[in-house]
């Protein structure tokens, strides 16, 4: 196994873990990095299984909260309403994602230039929203009514366009609907759990005939890197956005999208 391939797998896993839960689009970063690194994964296995590292990271960090919610379900109306709200928010992406999976993966994901443009446009939109003088009406995710959760879930559907960012779409939608920045990011975490598990299961099923474990080392390297980086981001993001907002992510999106366009132009 070439050392260069291991390094590329580690880099891509690190990128996946660092970008999955922040509003910069992990898909865009992983696809563009893989394109410029010339990384060839074994079948579709690497691209599918690398997501599992990030999924396990958020489940581990939020295990105590998830357990507390589960134990409260029999007696707490608030807990039941919260779980219902998260599942309701997940529903639009589940339905549209299942119906349009082939088109999204075979057409949109194969267009690096589109990804770069969407990164830039999304960065400009996120910057504008972060600068709006919005007055939050909701500061606790457990107070989000189901109707608000559903609207946030509809925003999440925009993330099916590579480069949009699942967390970016949900956070932007939540802010526009009257949430504060911290709870918007936290609801995005909770919504990520069923969404990422569902997307992972669908990808695994759709790619079942192409899956290959010929290079377990590459898969393990990317998985571990995504897992460790994901833990770091999930543990630190809420405090970060409470103090700095989302402008740093907006600027990063614009820079990466611009650099990607320049790179694609130079490489012809």
Swiss-Prot record:
Q: Does the keyword Lipoprotein apply?
A: no
What is this protein's name?
A: Undecaprenyl-diphosphatase
Identify the keywords attached in UniProt to this record, alphabetized: Antibiotic resistance, Cell inner membrane, Cell membrane, Cell shape, Cell wall biogenesis/degradation, Hydrolase, Membrane, Peptidoglycan synthesis, Transmembrane, Transmembrane helix
Cite any additional comment in the entry: Bacitracin is thought to be involved in the inhibition of peptidoglycan synthesis by sequestering undecaprenyl diphosphate, thereby reducing the pool of lipid carrier available.
Question: What family does the entry list?
Answer: Belongs to the UppP family.
Q: Name one Pfam family in it.
A: BacA
What's the protein's topology in the membrane? Multi-pass membrane protein
Residues that span the membrane, as ranges: 5-25, 43-63, 84-104, 107-127, 184-204, 213-233, 248-268
Q: Print the organism lineage.
A: Bacteria, Pseudomonadati, Pseudomonadota, Alphaproteobacteria, Hyphomicrobiales
Check the record and name the InterPro entries matching this protein.
Answer: UppP
Please list the reactions this protein catalyses.
Answer: di-trans,octa-cis-undecaprenyl diphosphate + H2O = di-trans,octa-cis-undecaprenyl phosphate + phosphate + H(+)
Q: List the Gene Ontology MF annotations in alphabetical order.
A: undecaprenyl-diphosphatase activity
What this chain does, per the entry, is described as: Catalyzes the dephosphorylation of undecaprenyl diphosphate (UPP). Confers resistance to bacitracin.
Localization annotation: Cell inner membrane
The enzyme's E.C. designation: 3.6.1.27
- Offer a single GO CC term for the protein: plasma membrane
HAMAP family attached here? Undec_diphosphatase
| Highest taxon of the lineage | Bacteria
User: What's an example Gene Ontology biological process for this entry?
Assistant: response to antibiotic
